[in-house]
């Protein structure tokens, strides 16, 4: 997680210094972040029912 935050900060610095013409890198990072977020949500969605089967209340 720390590496991703560092990568995002560096990408923001790059976008500010070079201007919007080279800010395509930011779009790629945004798409990666959204994909990771969706994968994490899917993983949690799969893990919750399994957890409920293993640890009934």
Swiss-Prot record:
The UniProt keyword set, sorted, is: Antibiotic, Antimicrobial, Immunity, Innate immunity, Secreted, Signal
Expression triggers? In response to mating.
Specify the domain of life of the species encoding this protein: Eukaryota
Q: Which tissues is this protein detected in according to the database?
A: Ejaculatory duct of adult males.
* Pfam families referenced in this protein's UniProt entry, alphabetically: Cecropin
General function of this protein: Male-specific peptide with moderate activity against Gram-positive bacteria.
The name under which this protein is listed is: Andropin
């Amino acid at each position: 997680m720390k590496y991703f935050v560092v990568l995002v900060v560096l990408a923001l610095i790059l976008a500010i210094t070079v201007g919007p013409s080279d800010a395509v890198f930011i779009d790629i990072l945004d798409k990666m972040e959204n994909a990771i977020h969706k994968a994490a949500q899917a993983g949690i969605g799969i893990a919750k029912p399994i957890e409920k089967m293993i640890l009934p209340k």
